[in-house]
Amino acid sequence: MSQPIKLLVGLANPGPEYAKTRHNAGAWVVEELARIHNVTLKNEPKFFGLTGRLLINSQELRVLIPTTFMNLSGKAIAALANFYQIKPEEIMVAHDELDLPPGVAKFKQGGGHGGHNGLKDTISKLGNNKEFYRLRLGIGHPGHKDKVAGYVLGKAPAKEQECLDAAVDESVRCLEILMKDGLTKAQNRLHTFKAE
């Protein structure tokens, strides 16, 4: 990984009614990282989201939770990235991932959107650049594509939520490893983790 990550984004829908839904898993990572570093996220209207700044291994990391709806996330990401001159390949987007089970998380660079509206808008607003990193947080799949919308906007049962929370905690630890020691070390640790 030649470039350090300069912006971590947690995809989410705004408002208390969505806070604990599976679709907001990406935001949980940003919230947990901010909590550990005692950073209060502030509402920044010009960036259409909640933002903060923290130092990991003396590297500056900006964090963002868009307060647009999910399908407009790219507007917030592009606004902040353009303002601070952050390149797509210096951005990590944390998002819920249907193709991984709850309790599993993976890092990835580049690729498509896999039907995820937040990723779709991010790619579009970054000028069709797909080279940003992703932190894919497994939420499992409801089994049929017609059930996906209700599933991602639903809340996980308690046991499943425990797995999601454990994966968020491990992801935060691995993000710090990534900032200090690079992607390979962080991947090696995160990709062997599975909360039961």
UniProtKB/Swiss-Prot annotation:
Its EC number is 3.1.1.29. One of its GO terms (molecular function) is peptidyl-tRNA hydrolase activity. Its main location: cytoplasm. It catalyses: an N-acyl-L-alpha-aminoacyl-tRNA + H2O = an N-acyl-L-amino acid + a tRNA + H(+). The active site is at residue 23. The record marks 96 as: Stabilizes the basic form of H active site to accept a proton. One of its GO terms (biological process) is rescue of stalled ribosome. It holds the Pfam family Pept_tRNA_hydro. Keywords: Cytoplasm, Hydrolase, RNA-binding, tRNA-binding. The record marks 13 as: Discriminates between blocked and unblocked aminoacyl-tRNA. It is found in: Cytoplasm. GO terms for cellular component: cytoplasm. TRNA binds at residues 18, 69, 71, 117. SUPFAM superfamilies: Peptidyl-tRNA hydrolase-like (SSF53178). Hydrolyzes ribosome-free peptidyl-tRNAs (with 1 or more amino acids incorporated), which drop off the ribosome during protein synthesis, or as a result of ribosome stalling. Catalyzes the release of premature peptidyl moieties from peptidyl-tRNA molecules trapped in stalled 50S ribosomal subunits, and thus maintains levels of free tRNAs and 50S ribosomes. Belongs to the PTH family. Monomer. This is Peptidyl-tRNA hydrolase. It comes from Vibrio cholerae serotype O1 (strain ATCC 39315 / El Tor Inaba N16961).
